[in-house]
């Protein structure tokens, strides 16, 4: 009987140490519920939205390819970027979307080349905070939403070639790097219909670290001699040397 009681106490103690800390009703919410969906079988058709109630913009880790209504699926093992989204459902798809992705090593823009393996064991998802370890780049990404934007924090390894990719997606987009202000501005027109002819979603990214590398990207072509691109599919790459554990805020 004493052994049984000791076992029960040990089990409860272990559970207490690993149980999630609840500070409010929002902590009962798991944004990952309903994300194991695909076109052939809907099991929720949700995505892990990081957002404030009635926020203007939502953010989501993007496992699907550009234009895929199933932007995040639980059984995927690669993240291509962290997307600003306004998507009501995968069937209706998205509008006004663009993505941000930290990478290390080679300066690449292609969504498959920049993608990184990740594990749900190294992923934290709540409505008000998201964190994941990008194994291929050895970078930790954290996101906290605001009413109209979000705060990003990237924790880089020691690397002479650390970058952030900004992908304004296709359908007509514009991106400009402003090194003197540690800033990237631009717009995306990506949509799935039902928007005005002059629709644009403008964005501004401000970094707390100066750029030592800059490049504009037009239709997949990376040009280090240009600071802006205005084309069917525009984007940008900025880079810097980082120390082990150095955090870059956006």
Predicted regions and their residues:
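Bacterial Sec-dependent N-terminal signal peptides
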Residues: 1-21
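Accessory carbohydrate-recognition regions in carbohydrate-active enzymes
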Residues: 20-250
């Amino acid at each position: 009987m004493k052994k049984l009681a000791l076992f029960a106490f040990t089990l409860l103690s272990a559970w207490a140490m690993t149980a999630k800390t609840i500070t409010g009703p929002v902590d009962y919410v798991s944004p990952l519920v309903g994300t194991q969906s695909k076109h052939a079988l809907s099991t929720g058709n949700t995505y892990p939205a990081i957002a404030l109630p009635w926020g203007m913009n939502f953010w989501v880790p993007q496992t699907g390819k550009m234009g895929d209504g199933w932007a995040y699926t639980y059984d995927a093992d690669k993240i291509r970027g962290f997307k600003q989204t306004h998507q009501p459902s995968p069937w209706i798809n998205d509008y006004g979307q663009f993505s941000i992705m930290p990478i290390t090593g080679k300066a690449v823009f292609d969504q498959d080349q920049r993608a990184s393996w990740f594990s749900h064991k190294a992923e934290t998802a709540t409505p008000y905070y998201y964190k994941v370890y990008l194994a291929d780049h050895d970078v930790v990404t954290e996101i906290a939403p605001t009413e109209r934007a979000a705060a990003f924090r990237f924790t880089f390894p020691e690397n002479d070639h650390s970058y952030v990719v900004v992908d304004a997606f296709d359908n007509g987009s514009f991106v400009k790097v402003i090194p003197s202000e540690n800033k990237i501005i631009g717009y995306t027109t990506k949509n799935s219909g039902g928007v005005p002819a002059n629709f644009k979603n403008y964005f501004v990214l401000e970094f707390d670290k100066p750029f030592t590398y800059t490049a504009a990207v037009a239709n997949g072509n990376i040009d280090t001699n240009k600071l802006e691109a205005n084309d069917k599919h525009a984007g940008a790459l900025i880079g810097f040397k980082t120390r082990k554990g150095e955090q870059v805020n956006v």
